[in-house]
Amino acid sequence: MQQQALQAAAQAYSTNVLAKYPWIDQGFLVPDPVPEELTLPFRELAQKYNFSALLAVIAQFNWWTGDISTIPALYGIKGLGPGLLRSLFGEFILSANGDTRAIYDAAAGVLGDSVLLDSDVVEVKRDVKIDEKTTSGVTVLVKQPGGSHKLIRARKLIVAIPPTMENIASYDLTANESALFSKFSALGYWAGVATVHGLNTSLTNVGAQTPFNQPAIPGTNGFNSAGSPGDFLVAVGFQDTDYTEEDAKAVLVKNLATLAAVGAVPKDAAETVTFPYVSDHKPYCVRVSAEEIKGGFYSKLLALEGARNTYWAGATFSGHNSALVWSFNEGTVLPGLKKDLGL
C-alpha cells in the first residue's frame, strides 16, 4: 500500500512539477520572471500537486535539507530531480570499488605537485596583468603547510567552495558580488564514523511527531553500517553553523543513551562510543530566502559566470548531489571557460 502511494505521488510529481522545470538537474537556471510556486513552502506545493507522500523520502535521501516542509519549493525540487527520481525506482550508479574519492584521487595523480593540499588562500585578485601576453588574468596567493607562500598566476579562476562572505573574505569582491553573496545563509552538517561495540545492525532515526517524520534538530539521521563490525556512518544536522565538534558528538551520545535505556543498543554505548573519523561540512546547503528567489537572485548569480575571469561552481550553484555538480560543470562552466580561452 505504501509503495503504491509513493508511486502515485512520484507520477504526480513528475507530471506536474518536473515536466515544467526540465532544467532542474542542470543548475539553478531559474527563469525570469520566477514562477511563484517555486517560492512556496515545499509542503504547500506538495499538497497542490498531491505528492506529499514523497516529502519524507526526499528528506531522507538528501539529509540534511533543513525542514523539508518549510524550505522554498525550489530547494525541495532540487532534492529530487529526474535523475534521482529514476534511481529511487530503479538503480543507483556507484563507484565500482565503493570508494567515492577514487575520481578525485585520480585527478590528483594527474595534476601531481600542482595540487596544493591544506593550503590557505591569502589573497585573490581577478582582473590583473599577469604577463606581457595576458593583460587581464588572476593571481592567487596561498599559504602552504609550514608557512611558505606561493603565488599562482592564471588566465581564469574556478571557485568551487561555498561562496559565503567568510569563505571568500580574501577575494577582491565587487559591490555587486558582495551584495549577492551576503544574502546567503547556511545549515550545519557534521559527519563521521562512530564505533559502537556490540551494535550489529543499522538504526534509522524517524521522528514520530515531526512533519514528514524528520528527526528533531539538532539531531542525527541514524547509525548506518559502515561495512566493518561496530562501525557506523553518522551525520548530525544543525539549523545554522554555530556549533562545535563537541556539540555534534554530544547529540550522538545523547541518542545512544536514549536507545540504551530501551535496550536498543548495549547499555554502555553512550560511555564507550568513539569517533575515529570526523568531518565538518559547514557551511552546508548555502541558500537564500524565498523573497530573494522571487526577486531574481539566481539570474543575478548566474550572470557572474565568466565575469572578472572567474567561474563559480559547486553545490551552491547546482545542488548537493555529485551528478548535479558535474552536470552544471559540463553544461555551464566548461563551455564558457573553453570559449573564453579560445579552445
Feature-to-residue mapping (PLM):
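Conserved beta-strand termini and adjacent loop/short-helix elements that scaffold enzyme active sites
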Residues: D118-D120, K143, A313
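Dinucleotide-binding Rossmann-like beta1-alpha1 core, especially the glycine-rich loop
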Residues: M1-A19, P31-D32
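Active-site/ligand-binding neighborhood in enzyme catalytic cores
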Residues: L18-E132
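Active-site-proximal substrate-binding core of FAD-dependent oxidoreductases
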Residues: L337-L343
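Acidic, glycine-rich loop-and-beta core segments that form the ion-binding/anion-interacting portion
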Residues: V122-D127, D131-Q144, I158-I161
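Core beta-strand elements of the Rossmann-like FAD/NAD(P) dinucleotide-binding domain
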Residues: G146-K156
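C-terminal segments that line or cap access tunnels to active or ligand-binding sites in enzymes
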Residues: A154-K156, T164-E330, G336-L337
